[in-house]
């Protein structure tokens, strides 16, 4: 599949979607995007910058949600033009899709909205590549009908993203079989290595996380075989305004990516035949 200006798939190198969870300030987004461009350029990794203008599903109603649509799009446009990288953001049910699609290169649907038929169709009808996150409550094979809805709009640039499955209260688990199962959708599969270590609502008024397991799950996913990696990152996760406990430190991103790209090369060299 053609994504932005590069090809993605199991016959192509791993690509990266990364950035801070939420847009905190113009300068932070430019700094992080610039550093990620430097790292990915050095390693030869195709890169899409990600950040959200509105986090509509925060645990607490008083938590920081972002700068909003107008200011958020200004920041994303600045990142795109000044840093020279494609940008992705997530949208919601009442987002003016065409307005967002006029700025960003890739749209993303939140996991909680994966079963909302009209929403999925409206996003995909905007004509941009779409990264559809699998709900924490959804079986991997249940992504096939979701993709069918998405492609019924005529949009063939659809990706599916694994971000963990609910495992009791305040916990997620990553079933690596799902990455293989979701290939049956015919779409590139992306693994979200940072939300997969989230502890939803685990801190009472906010979600917790176990970022020490990000490399563990990322390595496992790459070994199974994926097209892309999604990872939220921050210069100082302890001060991040959203999802800090599961964000990967920016100064450790190069080391992680270097390892993952080596694993990706070996994995894809040996193919993906299923064994009975």
From Swiss-Prot:
The record's listing under InterPro entries reads: Aldolase_TIM, DAHP1/KDSA, KDO8P_synthase
Q: What S-S linkages are listed for this chain? A: none
Q: E.C. number, please?
A: 2.5.1.55
| Catalytic activity of the protein | D-arabinose 5-phosphate + phosphoenolpyruvate + H2O = 3-deoxy-alpha-D-manno-2-octulosonate-8-phosphate + phosphate
Q: Which GO terms describe its molecular function?
A: 3-deoxy-8-phosphooctulonate synthase activity
Q: Which UniProt keywords apply?
A: Cytoplasm, Lipopolysaccharide biosynthesis, Transferase
Which pathway does the database say it acts in? Carbohydrate biosynthesis; 3-deoxy-D-manno-octulosonate biosynthesis; 3-deoxy-D-manno-octulosonate from D-ribulose 5-phosphate: step 2/3; Bacterial outer membrane biogenesis; lipopolysaccharide biosynthesis
EC top class, as a word: transferase
**UniProt similarity note:** Belongs to the KdsA family.
Q: What is this protein called?
A: 2-dehydro-3-deoxyphosphooctonate aldolase
**Which organism does this record belong to?**
Xanthomonas axonopodis pv. citri (strain 306)
User: Which gene underlies this protein?
Assistant: kdsA
């Amino acid at each position: 599949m053609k994504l932005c200006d590069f090809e993605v798939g199991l016959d192509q190198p791993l690509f990266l979607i990364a950035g801070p969870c939420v847009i905190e300030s113009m300068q932070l987004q430019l700094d992080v995007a610039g550093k990620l461009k430097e790292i990915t350029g050095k390693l030869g990794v195709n890169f899409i910058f990600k950040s959200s203008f509105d986090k509509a599903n925060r645990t607490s109603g008083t938590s920081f949600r972002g700068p909003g649509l107008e200011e958020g799009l200004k920041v994303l446009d600045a990142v795109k033009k000044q840093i020279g990288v494609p940008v992705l953001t997530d949208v919601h049910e009442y987002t003016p899709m065409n307005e967002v699609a006029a700025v960003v290169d890739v749209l993303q649907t939140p996991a909680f909205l994966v079963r909302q038929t009209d929403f999925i169709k409206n996003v995909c009808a905007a004509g941009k590549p779409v990264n559809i996150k699998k709900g924490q409550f959804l079986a991997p094979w249940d992504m096939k009908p979701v993709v069918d809805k998405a492609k019924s709009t005529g949009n063939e640039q659809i990706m599916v993203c694994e971000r963990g499955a609910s495992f009791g209260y305040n916990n997620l688990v990553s079933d690596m079989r799902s990455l293989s199962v979701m290939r049956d959708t015919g779409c590139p599969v992306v693994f979200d290595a940072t939300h997969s270590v989230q502890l939803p609502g685990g801190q009472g008024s906010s979600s917790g996380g176990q970022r020490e397991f990000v490399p563990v799950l990322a390595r496992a996913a790459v070994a199974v075989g994926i097209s892309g990696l999604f990872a939220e990152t921050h210069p100082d996760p302890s001060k991040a305004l959203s999802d800090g406990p599961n964000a990967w430190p920016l100064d450790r991103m190069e080391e992680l990516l270097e390892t993952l790209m080596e694993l990706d090369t070996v994995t894809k060299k040996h193919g993906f035949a299923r064994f009975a």
